[in-house]
Amino acid sequence: MTIDIRRLRDRLPQEIADLESEARREGHRHIARLIDEWSIGDNRFDRDGERLLGAYVDGELAGIGGMTVETAMSGALRMRRFYIRPAMRGRGIGRMLALALLDHARSFCIVVTVHAGNDGAARFWESLGFQPDGRDGHTHLFALQHHSDDPAASNLHRCVTPRSP
């Protein structure tokens, strides 16, 4: 099994329709919202720090995940529209996709939020180091680590630190 993480830019992949159908069958509407927002231009994951990635297994789209500016928290980014096909779960694809997005975020900020839609998603995000923090529309926070020799540290003035409870 070969896993390839690709940046999605100019257009959504054709296979997104299959992903959306599978998500809808599971009761999830966030992939349909991704398609709708993309088609009308509301969200193309093209602002500073934003990114949309597709996870491909042996050339087939297995999942998708994005990072957008977190509007409820100054300087933070938010994981969005994250979905892995049910048949592809448990193979490390979601973890690889999430870690690629977190690695990207390190150049832009020190806090990433996510809204875990169910208990399984909450366990997944917590396994990556996200901490429960249910406010401002998100359920979890992740504090990214910067090192003093990290060139991204110069971006810290634009970011926030997690608030105390």
What are these regions (language model features)?
Residues 82-84:
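Hydrophobic adenine-recognition pocket in adenosine-nucleotide-binding enzymes
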Residues 3-75, 80, 104:
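Acetyl-CoA-dependent GNAT
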Residues 126-136:
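Conserved acetyl-CoA-binding loop of GNAT-fold acetyltransferases
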Residues 1-14, 18, 147-165:
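Conserved N-terminal entry element of GNAT/NAT acetyltransferase domains
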Residues 87-100:
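Conserved acetyl-CoA pyrophosphate-binding loop and the N-cap/start of the following alpha-helix
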Residues 89, 112-123, 138-141, 145:
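Conserved beta-strand-loop-alpha-helix junction that forms the acyl-donor binding cleft
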